[in-house]
Structure formats: C-alpha cells, structure tokens
C-alpha cells in the first residue's frame, strides 16, 4: 500500500510537470514571435506564474492571440485548450501545495511527538480494525501515528481523531525517527496479512540488535489469522523484544469460553454443537477440544454444515491427533440446510452449548433463530433451551441480536430467544483486551509459576518475563493454561472474580489428595489435547532415540520441528514413560502447577496489579 501511495504522489508531480510544459508550449508561438529567444523564454515562464496565480490581467492576451489566428475553427480549439490549461494548472498547483504543507505539518507533529516522553502507538495502516483500537486509546495520554496514511483525505479521519498523526511512510521507516528510550507500541494490523508479517519482521530486525536496556521498551503486535506466522516470527532473532501474535478468531473464542464456560451448562456430559465449519468455528473446535478436558466430565463435539468435507480434510491434515479415539468429534456434511437441520435433530438433540457462524451476519441470525425453534420443539414440554452463541461482526446487527437475548432486554416484544452474540469489533479491538486482558495477565503469572517450578527456588522476575516474550508458542500454551484455571475451579464448585467480595474462600482448604490427583489428570489431559490441536502427535521411545541421535531435537525428548512428543499419552502411562526417558516422574509438574493456582490468582509476583478472588458458585450436582 505504501508503494502505491508513493506511486500516486509521483503521478501527481509528473502530471503537474506535464501541465506546466503544455502551457509553456502552447504559448511559444506568441512569445517567441514577439520577443527574441531569451526574452521569449523569460516572458513565457513569467506567464506561467500568472496562470498559476489566476491573474485576470492576462485575459486581454487571449483576444490578441485569437485575433492573430486567421482560421476561426483553429482559434476556437486554441481557446478551449487555453481554458482547460488555465483551470487545471492552478487547481493542481494548489493541490500540490496543500500536500506539501500537510507533509510539513505532520513532520512538525512527528518532531514534537518524539520529544514528549508519553507512550507512542504506531499503526501500520488506517483501517476499520486499527481505527477501532485507536478509539480506545484516545482518552489516554499518548501519541498516535498511522503509517502509510498521509495521502488519505482529511475527511476520512473522524472528528474525535483529529490529533492523530498521519504519515505516508511505512511503519518501519517511521520507527527509525524515534528515540529508543520511550515506550513504543507497534501494531502491524494491515488488511494484507503478508504485509503485516513483513512489517513485523522489519521491526524485529531493526530492534533485535539494540541494547538490552532499549528492547523492553519496544512492543510489537502482529495481527494475523494464520497460525503458521507465529512459527516464522519465533524463528527470528528477537532478543528480548515484547512480540505478540494476535489471532482475532482465537481471541474471540477464548473470550467466549472464559465468559461462558462449557461447564456452566452441563452436569456431567458436555455436548457442543458447531453449526458450520468456517474459520471461527474451526478455531472454536480446536479450543473446545482441550478446554473441555475435565476429569468427571465427558466431552462430545458435533459439527454440522453444508459441504464441509474439504474443511474436515484440512483439519485432519493440520491436527490429526483429534481424530483419534481419545476424542468424540462427529462431522455431518450435508447437501443443503434442510439436511443439516435433520442431522441436528437426529444426532444433536442433547447439545448444551451451540455456536453458529454462517456465510454472513444475516445468515447467522437466521440459522440461530431456526435452531432455537428446533431445540424447543425437540422437547415435548418445550423446556430445551441450550445457549446459542452467534458470531456477529457488524455492530448494528450485534446490538439487534443482543435484544434477542432475553425478554427483559426487549420488553416491547416480550419474547425471549436467548441468542448471545459475540465477535463485535467494538468488544475485541480495545487496548485493554489486546494488551492487558485478565487472560493475558494470568498467562504471565502461569509462566512465572512454571519458572519457579523448574528453577526449584526464587526467580529473577525481569529475566523470566523476557523469556516469556521470546517464543509465541510458549505464550499460546500459557494462555490456554490460564483459561483452563476457571474450568478446574468449576470442578470444585468454585470460580474467580476481580470484584471485591467478603465471600472469598481459600483454595488450599479444598485441596485433598484426591482433588489434587483429579486436577492433575485434568491438567495433563488439557495439555495433551492442546498439543494435538496444534498438530503434535505422539512419539514412541524408538522415535525419541532416533530424533535425539539425528540432532534435530537438540537432545530433547520432544521435537518441535517434527511436532512429536512422547508424553502425549494417558495419565496412567506417564509415570513409567517419563522415568524411562528422563529418570523422573514428570507428573509432579502437573501437581505443582495445581498447587500454585492460588499464587497465580493472588498475583504473587505483582505483575497483574490485581488479585482474583476465589468464590463459591452453584455446583453442577445441585
């Protein structure tokens, strides 16, 4: 996009030059026959300035020129050409002047932004998502820059964003101009995701060689829906830069599963129905496959949609592990929507958690209403009302769907459809959600808990957090672990909240030997399922010896390049296997993490700057 903007600027300059040349040429017959060569050139150049400034005194010159032309037709054509040039040349000159002044103005803004010590936020592009994120920053004391946006019209910028700086340079070029000591946030959030990745890698290359005192002040957020991009970023030498890969669909699904836990709507059997298998439901399928791993619960996932065979094949290629007997996932690919409804009626009548995502927001709303009526009719007493979560992106349709949630929210209609929308840009693209969400804060605490477990003592928190920033794969694993904490608490009839309460309980009072084992099994099953949804597969002892000897695993028992891990196995087999491979029972790590949940929620390391109180909630058996 930046290259195209530069090309557009060059075209304007070239066009202006052509107009100047055309105006000069068309007056050559007059000035060069009236004056000698030198005076003719100077007079014609002076005349160009008169044209640009719209000097009315040159009107008499037209009459003199036309009078000197004998042919009336040629004279009329000549006058038309003069008129076009005398209109277009001043207009284009004024446009060029405004562009130059605007560029100078934005450069002055950039200079003062560089002198101020307040945080700086730089976006790679001005688009719907970056604009929504920018709005959430407007009330903070910061400077905001949109790269690659200077040639956009001022009218494209909303009134409440007038103090935002627009620059025509790329985000990497702007980065060179700023002091290295201030907190700087780069958001690579272009519509072209390949371009976003390119900008991210350029920024990493620039800052990875900076001093270690500089790198912690640099925060790079790369937005992409492609999971493989994180592998590319992890392979770059990024020092201790704070780099995060933001997957919009993953954020939406994690937020949904955290706000509306699977356990809330099930007593012992979790049955999730996914209507359709597009990108958002594929991400949901992966997350639910590990999120629903709970000792004492069974998990069943049903996916029904029109012609989903190709999507299923892609999923089987990228995550073959979830197609094994350990998982109960059924796919119903139908020829039309009527067949989909028939399949749901026949095989999914006991579903207690439903996610719908159609080809458009309208289709999603329509399908959700059909499913609501269907599930009511499946029960002779019309009491079957599982929650239906609708993926709605458009803000206006999102709000309309919210009115269908309960009768109380839409009293004029007095009708309850119990549809719960998710996916609005206004909900997800905020600074708080992206940077400091509860899940993100807890994931850092999970990382610090692991650091303590594997160091057998006190840790250097700053160095530990730097290690958190190095690999995206570790951050994704920690986020999944943080999300699952709520589910583990639900097994005990507990939950957590950030609100102050006098009803808080102490988790350690609930820890018995049986409870610790139950939660440890749940943690191992969650970890194993998470790896399999990421494409990992089990490896035998022979596999471990082979890739250890080859050097591809760098001596480790697992191999990230091959995505093979020997501990993808039942919990009961883990003790003997880990003793043989490592000489110790690795199940202890699961138990130690469970023991540290109070430290994670209590913000032992003072990273989250908030504490999560543990409270009682209605148990599933009550």
Regions found by a protein language model. Name each.
Residues 1-20, 32-42, 50, 56-526, ...:
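Cytosolic regulatory regions of ion transport systems
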């Amino acid at each position: 996009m930046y290259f195209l903007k530069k090309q557009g600027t060059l075209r304007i300059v070239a066009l202006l030059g052509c107009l100047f040349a055309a105006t000069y040429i068309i007056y050559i017959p007059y000035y060069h026959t009236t004056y000698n060569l030198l005076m003719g050139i100077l007079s014609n150049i002076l005349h160009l300035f008169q044209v640009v400034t719209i000097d009315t005194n040159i009107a008499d010159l037209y009459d003199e020129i036309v009078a000197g032309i004998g042919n009336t037709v040629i004279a009329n054509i000549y006058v038309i050409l003069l008129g076009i040039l005398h209109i277009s040349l001043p207009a284009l000159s004024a446009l060029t002047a405004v562009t130059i002044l605007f560029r100078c103005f934005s450069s002055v803004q950039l200079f003062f932004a560089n002198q101020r010590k307040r945080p700086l936020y730089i976006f790679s592009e001005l688009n719907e998502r970056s604009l929504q994120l920018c709005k959430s920053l407007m009330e903070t004391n910061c400077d905001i820059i949109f790269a690659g946006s200077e040639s956009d019209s001022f009218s494209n910028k909303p009134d409440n964003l007038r103090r935002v700086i627009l620059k025509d340079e790329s985000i990497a070029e702007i980065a060179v101009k700023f002091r290295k000591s201030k907190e700087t946030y780069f958001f690579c959030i272009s519509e072209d995701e390949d371009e976003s990745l390119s900008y991210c890698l350029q920024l990493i290359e620039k800052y990875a060689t900076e001093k270690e005192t500089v790198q912690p002040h640099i925060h790079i957020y790369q937005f992409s829906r492609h999971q493989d991009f994180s592998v590319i970023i992890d392979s770059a030498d990024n020092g201790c830069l704070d780099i995060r890969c933001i997957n919009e669909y993953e954020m939406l699904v994690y937020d949904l599963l955290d706000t509306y836990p699977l356990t809330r709507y099930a007593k012992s059997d979790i049955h999730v129905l996914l209507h359709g298998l597009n990108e958002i439901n594929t991400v949901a399928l992966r997350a639910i496959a590990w999120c629903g791993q709970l000792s004492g619960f069974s998990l069943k996932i049903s996916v029904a949609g029109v012609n989903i065979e190709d999507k299923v094949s892609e999923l089987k290629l990228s995550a073959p592990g979830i197609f094994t007997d350990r998982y109960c996932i059924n796919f119903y690919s139908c020829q039309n929507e009527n067949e989909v409804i028939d399949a749901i009626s026949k095989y999914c009548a006991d579903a207690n958690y439903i996610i719908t995502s159609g080809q458009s927001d309208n289709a999603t709303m329509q399908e959700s209403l059909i499913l609501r009526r269907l599930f009511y009719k499946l029960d002779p007493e019309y009491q079957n009302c599982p929650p239906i979560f609708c993926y709605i992106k458009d803000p206006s349709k999102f709000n309309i769907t919210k009115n269908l949630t309960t009768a109380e929210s839409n009293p004029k209609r007095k009708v309850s459809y119990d549809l719960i929308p998710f996916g609005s840009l206004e909900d997800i693209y905020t600074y708080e959600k992206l940077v400091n969400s509860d899940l993100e804060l807890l994931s850092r605490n999970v990382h610090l808990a692991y650091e303590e477990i594997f160091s057998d003592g006190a840790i250097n928190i700053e160095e530990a957090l730097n290690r958190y920033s190095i690999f995206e794969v570790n951050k994704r694993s920690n986020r999944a672990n943080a999300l699952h904490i709520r589910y583990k608490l639900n097994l005990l009839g507990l939950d957590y909240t950030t609100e102050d309460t006098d009803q808080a309980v102490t988790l350690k009072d609930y820890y018995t030997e049986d409870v610790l084992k139950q939660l440890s099994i749940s943690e191992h099953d969650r970890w194993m399922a998470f790896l399999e949804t990421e494409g990992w597969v089990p490896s035998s002892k022979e596999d471990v010896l082979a890739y250890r000897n080859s050097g591809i695993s760098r001596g480790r028992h697992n191999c990230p390049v091959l995505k093979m891990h020997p501990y993808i196995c039942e919990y009961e087999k883990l003790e003997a296997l880990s003793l043989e491979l490592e000489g110790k029972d690795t199940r202890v790590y699961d138990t130690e993490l469970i023991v540290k949940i109070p430290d994670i929620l209590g913000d032992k390391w003072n990273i989250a700057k908030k504490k999560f109180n543990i409270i009682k909630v209605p148990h599933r058996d009550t």
